[in-house]
């Protein structure tokens, strides 16, 4: 069964209005000139092409974004829920972590309280936690670029930002690797990622077990006025296990971004 997209927007319905007598009047020469002018503008816009090294520029900007994010602490709140056939949650996994980077840029995570686990059919695996850490807030840095094939898919406005749309797929997946397969919406002005939508891969199948992963969407926003950091991840997908379909929903909120220096002491509010 195909996976559902994290966000589904119904197509707008076109409405055909009856033509009035005035509407049937032949256009004036001024109208024709305006139509021609707008046609030329539209043709110019359609002819706009991305730079041939778009992926490299994105990776360069992503490296700068990663370096900037390494100067911030933040809070990461995860909710992963099993849903029944009516969309009601039957079990959940909840956790809150404070994410801290040392002056050597080593990542440290501190659980805030104990995780809440009421899942009945699913369990959280090492791959799930690895994806929460590295794939859902995906950063395609220059040292990651070689892992991916990329293809330009057009342009689109998202979150009021004019974007190039870039598809990325793993060239190959080595044993134990977790990679991203999906679409990136890239700001045309600075090549920063505004939005990403896809899936952590590979899906894991064995004779005795299956480890399947939902499609997700991650939204970024400007945090420091210069770099876009992840602020929200959302997934609502149906996983096709051999013993039956299981709908899941996941949210990850990245909040409380605070820039720190070596001598800084960061204090977080209680959740």
Task: Give short role names for the model-derived ranges.
Residues 1-30:
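N-terminal secretory signal peptides that target proteins for export/translocation
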Residues 2-4, 37, 160:
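Mature extracytoplasmic/luminal segments of secretory-pathway proteins
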Residues 24-26, 45-50:
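Extreme N-terminus of proteins, especially the signal/transit-peptide cleavage junction
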Residues 31-42:
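Bacterial N-terminal signal peptides
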Residues 47-181, 188-194, 199-214, 222-225, ...:
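Structured extracytoplasmic
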């Amino acid at each position: 069964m195909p996976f559902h997209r994290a966000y589904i927007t119904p197509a707008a319905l076109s409405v055909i209005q009856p033509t009035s007598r005035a509407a049937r009047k032949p256009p004036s020469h001024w109208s024709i000139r305006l139509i021609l002018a707008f046609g030329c503008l539209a043709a110019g816009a359609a002819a706009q092409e991305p730079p041939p090294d778009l992926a490299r520029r994105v990776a360069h900007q992503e490296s700068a974004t990663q370096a900037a994010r390494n100067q911030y602490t933040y809070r990461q709140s995860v909710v992963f829920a099993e849903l029944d056939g009516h969309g009601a949650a039957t079990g959940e996994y909840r956790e809150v972590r404070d994410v801290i980077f040392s002056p050597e840029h080593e990542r440290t995570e501190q659980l805030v309280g104990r995780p809440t686990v009421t899942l009945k059919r699913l369990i959280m695996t090492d791959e799930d936690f690895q994806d929460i850490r590295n794939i859902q807030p995906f950063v395609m840095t220059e040292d990651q670029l070689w892992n991916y094939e990329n293809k330009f898919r057009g342009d689109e406005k998202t979150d009021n930002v004019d974007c190039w749309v870039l598809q990325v797929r793993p060239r190959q997946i080595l044993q134990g690797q977790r990679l991203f397969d999906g679409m990136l919406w890239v700001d045309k002005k600075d090549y920063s990622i505004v939005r990403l939508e896809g899936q952590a891969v590979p899906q894991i199948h064995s004779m005795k077990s299956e480890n399947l992963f939902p499609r997700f969407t991650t939204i970024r926003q400007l945090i420091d006025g210069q770099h876009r950091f992840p602020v929200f991840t959302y997934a609502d997908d149906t996983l096709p296990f051999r013993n039956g379909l299981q709908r899941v929903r996941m949210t990850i909120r990245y909040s409380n971004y605070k820039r720190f220096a070596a001598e800084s002491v960061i204090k977080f509010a209680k959740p």
